[in-house]
Design a protein with these regions (language model features):
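Short cysteine/histidine-rich metal-coordination sites, predominantly Zn2+-binding motifs
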Residues: 8-15, 42-51, 70-71
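Short, cysteine/histidine-rich loop/knuckle motifs that typically chelate Zn2+
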Residues: 1, 29, 55-59
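Activation segment
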Residues: 13, 34-36, 95
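HIT superfamily nucleotide-processing domains
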Residues: 47-173
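Short Cys/His-centered divalent metal-binding micro-motifs
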Residues: 23-45
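Histidine-centered nuclease catalytic patch
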Residues: 1-25
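Short Cys/His-rich "knuckle" micro-motifs
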Residues: 1-9, 35-39, 64-67
Length: 173
């Protein structure tokens, strides 16, 4: 748990008021770093976490896990245990994720990896991947990270791993 502080968007010493419209919540560390030196307004970022797209199949999912991210089983798994980890906020580009979302996704990836290893001793490796944009193969425009369990001998020659997205480049020459 992190302590929250009330912060003035426009600091009082720069003419900011005590009105509600000029206040935001920041964690104690962020507030201490911001101090009264700038008028950075973080409220829009906080509000953006609630954005959902009514037409997005991932935005419609109600799953536990974390307030910023969650995990689901892939409906078209490459291997048994194939999971998708994604932010709750509707955002299509991996590179547009906010750092707290990346942190939540990373935490869930680690937890799911541990869970899979404890329940299936045949797992000997993982592929972790993101398709960012249609030209990279992204078909659902809501960021999702694939966690794909691998097993010894699940394919003849796995060397090259994710390089296989361009088949002629998978083999190291």
């Amino acid at each position: 748990e992190t302590q929250l502080d009330v912060d003035h968007v426009v600091p009082r010493n720069k003419g900011g008021s005590n009105e509600l419209a000029n206040l935001q919540m920041l964690c104690r560390t962020c507030n201490a770093q911001k101090r009264d030196n700038d008028d950075t307004d973080f409220r829009a970022i906080t509000e953006s976490y609630g954005f959902r797209d009514a037409d997005c199949i991932f935005c419609q999912k109600e799953c536990g896990d974390d307030e910023l991210a969650f995990v689901v089983e892939d409906e078209y798994p490459v291997t048994e245990g194939h999971a998708l980890v994604m932010p709750r906020r509707h955002v299509s580009d991996y590179f547009a994720l906010h750092q707290p979302e990346r942190n939540a996704i990373e935490r869930i990836l680690h937890n799911r990896q541990k869970e899979l290893l404890s329940r299936d001793p045949s797992i000997s490796g993982f592929n972790v991947g993101v398709n960012s944009g249609p030209s990279a193969g992204q078909t659902i425009l809501h960021v999702h990270i694939h966690l794909i369990p691998r097993r010894d001998d699940d394919m003849d020659d796995p060397r090259g791993g994710v390089r296989g997205v361009i088949p002629e480049k998978q083999k190291y020459l």
